[in-house]
Amino acid sequence: MARLLLVCLGGALGSGARYLTSAWALRAFGPDFPRGTLLVNVSGSFLLAGIMTASLQSEAVPPDLRLFLAAGVMGGFTTYSSFNYETLALVEQGRLAAAAAYLLATVLGCLAAAFAATLLVRWLAG
């Protein structure tokens, strides 16, 4: 039960952070392209890969903290379902180039961010 609470609390924090990040991106850039979800998913991929690499390479991240951060905070923060919905919305609006750009930016951006975080954490760990 305690572990479930860790995930739920982390999820609440991650969801709040996702909302704030998306709201900021909407105000900063406007509604023409889903930059908020892109920012959330790329940064979330970086953070999750960093958390997992650090926790699997050393004892620095205890298992309960990893559960709170990875399954909880990052699970609440990143949003694959929004990515799919926004891509479909762009297609339905006839904005095929924007849909393709968003799809590629998300997939490649998230992979690149995860790779960069893994390399960074391994480098920092020596």
UniProtKB/Swiss-Prot annotation:
The chain crosses the membrane at residues 4-24, 36-56, 67-85, 101-121. GO terms for cellular component: plasma membrane. Keywords: Cell inner membrane, Cell membrane, Ion channel, Ion transport, Membrane, Metal-binding, Sodium, Transmembrane, Transmembrane helix, Transport. It is found in: Cell inner membrane. It is a multi-pass membrane protein. The keyword Membrane applies. The keyword Secreted does not apply. Na(+) binds at residues 75, 78. InterPro entries: FluC (IPR003691). GO terms for molecular function: fluoride channel activity; metal ion binding. It catalyses: fluoride(in) = fluoride(out). Na(+) is not transported, but it plays an essential structural role and its presence is essential for fluoride channel function. GO terms for biological process: cellular detoxification of fluoride. Fluoride-specific ion channel. Important for reducing fluoride concentration in the cell, thus reducing its toxicity. PANTHER family: FLUORIDE EXPORT PROTEIN 1-RELATED (PTHR28259:SF1). HAMAP family: FluC (MF_00454). Belongs to the fluoride channel Fluc/FEX (TC 1.A.43) family. This is Fluoride-specific ion channel FluC. The lineage of its organism: Bacteria, Pseudomonadati, Myxococcota, Myxococcia, Myxococcales. The gene is fluC.
